[in-house]
Amino acid sequence: LGLGYISAYLQNWFAEAINVRLMVFPEDLDHAVAGDLKPDIVGFGTFTWNRNLTDYYSKKIKDAINPLILYGGQELPIGSDQQTRFMMERPFVDFCVPAEGEIGMRNIVERYLNSSKDIESMKIKAIEGVIFLDSNSDLVSENNEIEPVNLNDLPSPILTGVFDDFFQKGLTPMLQFVRGCPNKCAYCRQGSVESKKIRRYPSKISLEAILYLEKRVENIGKHLSKLAEDHGCKPVGEC
């Protein structure tokens, strides 16, 4: 769901300057590398449950076509020492975007386009909301807790059709009505001060997304959606 929001946001922001393609299945990545797609930037949502698979494909893709590789997700390390260790263990990863990804990803794409797509020249100075290692393997980090995207300005990946192909393949639709978490779990990035700010998506957009799913998902025999909130993921019927 997070990658869907980022995809819709970037495509809306940069319009025809870029072409964003969302992939979920490993075989799609294999086809992209082996075929004619040859992406300039490949981003992964990395979590505990998919870390080994993500590392495997990141290295494979980097060795094959050498695109810009970046990691994002709420389970990236928080402290600078842990972030440095994480990136040094993964030399095939160029950049990481901690916490919410829309603004950091936008800054990476802007820097990439303005640097003639040269990855090393992108690292001459810090990128807001992004971490990376410089030529001396020192961590470069600037304002990781940047002001998050305004949810009123965020296109819905459901209403823009980003997920349509995945519904046809039987994946469970997911919805999100709020971002942020009031809990203070020390092990979780959502326990940070910034993440405690509860922000709601516009009610009109949320309702339109539900109606959109009702029309499309019912026809393929799916009757269950999940609510993916920062404080937990549960079936919509339980909410």
For each of these PLM feature ranges, what is it?
Residues L1-L3:
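Glycine- and acidic-residue-enriched helix-capping/strand-helix junction motifs
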Residues A8, K59, T84-R85, N152, ...:
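Active-site phosphate/pyrophosphate- and oxyanion-stabilizing loops and adjacent acidic/basic residues
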Residues G129, L139-V140, L151, T172-M174:
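A residue-level signal for beta-strand positions that form part of recognition/binding surfaces
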Residues N152-C239:
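Radical SAM [4Fe-4S] cluster-binding motif and immediate context
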